[in-house]
Amino acid sequence: MSLLTEVETPTRNEWECRCSGSSDPLVVASSIIGILHLILWILDRLFFKCIYRRLKYGLKRGPSTEGVPESMREEYRQEQQSAVDVDDGHFVNIELE
């Protein structure tokens, strides 16, 4: 007997699951694993950007500035900002008609 043919059987009123009242440990374990898998899949799809960004970059927030004079901190911030500033000369402007 295959589990696939025994799970759902038609009755007069509606479809019923024969395993719903079963106390078989294998059925209980597979049900729990199935529910956990579904919950984890839903959470993964909802929060995949946050989760994978955390895995990729960790909790790093940049280098520590403890013990560094304020003038050097400001210089570092300006260097970082200038590194991210966009130079328009590197891009081609395309106008759509």
UniProtKB/Swiss-Prot annotation:
Keyword terms of this UniProt record: Disulfide bond, Host cell membrane, Host membrane, Host-virus interaction, Hydrogen ion transport, Inhibition of host autophagy by virus, Ion channel, Ion transport, Lipoprotein, Membrane, Palmitate, Phosphoprotein, Signal-anchor, Transmembrane, Transmembrane helix, Transport, Viral ion channel, Virion
Lipid-carrying residues in chain (S-palmitoyl cysteine): C50
Membrane-traversing stretches: 23-43
Side of membrane Intravirion, spans: 44-97
Pfam family name, one: Flu_M2
Sites annotated Essential for channel activity, possibly by being protonated during channel activation, and by forming the channel gate and the selective filter: H37
A GO term, aspect molecular function: monoatomic ion channel activity
Record membrane topology: Single-pass type III membrane protein
Location in the cell: Virion membrane; Host apical cell membrane
GO cellular component terms given for this protein: host cell plasma membrane; membrane; virion membrane
Domain of life according to the entry: Viruses
GO biological process: protein complex oligomerization; symbiont genome entry into host cell via pore formation in plasma membrane; symbiont-mediated suppression of host autophagy
Side of membrane Virion surface, spans: 1-22
Chain spans, region Disordered: 60-83
Gene3D superfamilies for this protein: 6.10.250.1640
Positions marked as site (Seems to be involved in pH gating): W41
Control of this protein's activity: The M2 protein from most influenza A strains is inhibited by amantadine and rimantadine, resulting in viral uncoating incapacity. Emergence of amantadine-resistant variants is usually rapid.
Residues where Phosphoserine is found: S64, S82
Subunit note: Homotetramer; composed of two disulfide-linked dimers held together by non-covalent interactions. May interact with matrix protein 1.
Function: Forms a proton-selective ion channel that is necessary for the efficient release of the viral genome during virus entry. After attaching to the cell surface, the virion enters the cell by endocytosis. Acidification of the endosome triggers M2 ion channel activity.
HAMAP family reported for this sequence: INFV_M2
Membership in a protein family: Belongs to the influenza viruses matrix protein M2 family.
Domain free text: Cytoplasmic tail plays an important role in virion assembly and morphogenesis.
Remarks, miscellaneous: When the channel is activated, one or more imidazole moieties of His-37 probably become bi-protonated.
Protein known as: Matrix protein 2
